[in-house]
Structure formats: C-alpha cells, structure tokens
Amino acid sequence: MNRDGKGVYKEENRKPTLPFFFKLLWRKLSQLIRLNLMLMVQAIPILVLVYVYLAGYKTATATEMLYAPLYGISKIAPVGGITALLDTQSIQMGIPIFTPVMLIVLICLGVLLAITFGWFNAGSAYVLRGLFRGDPVFIWSDFFYAIKRNLKQAFFMGLLDFACIAVLVSDFIFFYSRTGSSYGNDVMYLMIFAISIVYVIMRFYMYQLMITFDLSTMKILKNSLIFTILGIKRNVLAMIGLLLLIVLNAVFIVMFLSVGITIPMVLPLFYIMAVMGFITTYAAYPVIDKYMIAPYANDNVPEPTEETEASEISDKE
C-alpha cells in the first residue's frame, strides 16, 4: 500500500517546539497544498461574498436611531442645540445595494456555505491532526472519513460556528464604523474585538475536540473556552503566526502589484488556508494531549471524575 506522505521518523524528537514547527511544515508542505486545493471549494463562496460586499455599489445610510427624529426637528426648528446634537448622530455606514438576481445568488451561496461549513472544518481538522502527529495520511479518504464519522455533529457545529462568525463580523463592521461617535460605541467596539479574539482561539480547539473525543457540543465549546486560558502561551504564538502570515502575504501582493506583477495575488490560494490550519493545530493539539489524553493514557491512572468531564470522553481515533 502506498502512503500519502511519510509517517513518524524513528528516534526523532517530536517535541512541538518552534524550530520543529518549521521543520514539520516544510516536510508536509506538499500535502498541505493538496489539502488547500480541497478547501478552495469552501473558500469560493466566501471570496464571492467578500468581493461583492467590497466592490459592489453602496449607499451611505445613517445608523444612529436618533438621526431621523433629530433631522426632522432641525428642519422645523433649526436651533443651535439641535443642530449640534444632529452632528453627533450623523455617522453614516455604506450599505450594499443588490439587484434581486444578485441577492438570490448571494443567499444561495450563503446557505451552501453554512450547510457545508462544519463538514469542511471537520475533514480538514482530521487531516491536519494526522499530519501533526506523523500518522500515515491519505488526504482524500481521511478527509471524507472524518466527515462521515462526524456527519451530524459537524453539521450542527458548523451552523453554530457560521452563525457566531457572521454575528461577530457584522457587529465588528457596525461598531467600527461608529467609533469616535460616543463612549458607548467605543466600549462596544472594544468588547466585540475582545470577544472575536477569544472566539478565534476557541476555534483552534473546537473541531480537534470533536474529531478526537465523543463529547457533546456544549462540552466542546466549554472545553475550548477553558483551553484559551490553559494554552495561552501557544495560543498567543499561534495568533502572532497567523497575523505574520497574513501581513507577509499582503505585503508581497502590494509590492509586486506596484510593478505590474499579479502572481502573488494567486499564490496564497494554493496554501494559505491549509497553512493557517496547520499553525492552529500545531498550537492546539499539544494542549489537548496534555490535559485530556496523556493523564489517562496509563491504565493505572484512576478513572476521571465528573468534575473533569473526562468521564464522557471516548477516543474517536
């Protein structure tokens, strides 16, 4: 049987340090590229939605609830106090304008993305876990094996995940457009920003926990939140790595576009999603192993209690 990539190297020190990350990344790069090409099927609706929002026609719309009544009062009684108050409530936000056909297409793309979101994440999480652990990995078959094994839970987890991301992104855009208008809006913007960071880190663990253990969705979310603290060192390094990856790609695109070269705009489509997933898996799985696998690997260790919630853990491997 031919293996899709190499397994564990004998006598190799696989301690998940920063130097070993680059060594393993280089070793698994070809497999990550193949995985990324599969993930592009999921990325196409996202790219279309982002492009339509950024490039489509927008109309400036006032977002403050007091704007309309204050505007009416200012027309009837244009006194200085009302005019000054109206100025503070005149923050505008660009609202996209869609034709009926375009709106139907976007809704269909959004529904398709929401339905398949959890399945793609479950499949990629399983493959990335295998690449990190040095298991023999068959990209195509392992990807769909994970989806089949977690079909129902991945579907509902994906819907919940997609809804949370959609709410956080829309809230972030909304309150970002209103920063500086009032103290309350500034506080809400900072809160949404902080919650978004926490949720991004939770996503490092959510699908890894789902494919590895037999846990309820609520326990997965709870443990993922706990791991944002327990693995804070690795989580921060992973966030820095993701930020550097995005910034470096953006810099290269801008640099080459300035001289008329468009290739850097296409190259990230071949690797960036899988590499980002590899970074998060490299950060998250050692934390999961430390707290949920290693303590119970020895048969002599007492059975876990309800307090640790590990009594409900059953390895899916």
Regions found by a protein language model. Name each.
Residues 187-196:
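Alpha-helical transmembrane segments of multi-pass membrane proteins
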Residues 1-173, 185, 202-204, 209-239, ...:
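Helix-coil boundary and N-terminal low-complexity module in membrane systems
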Residues 174-181:
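Membrane-interface helix termini and inter-helical loops of multi-pass transporters
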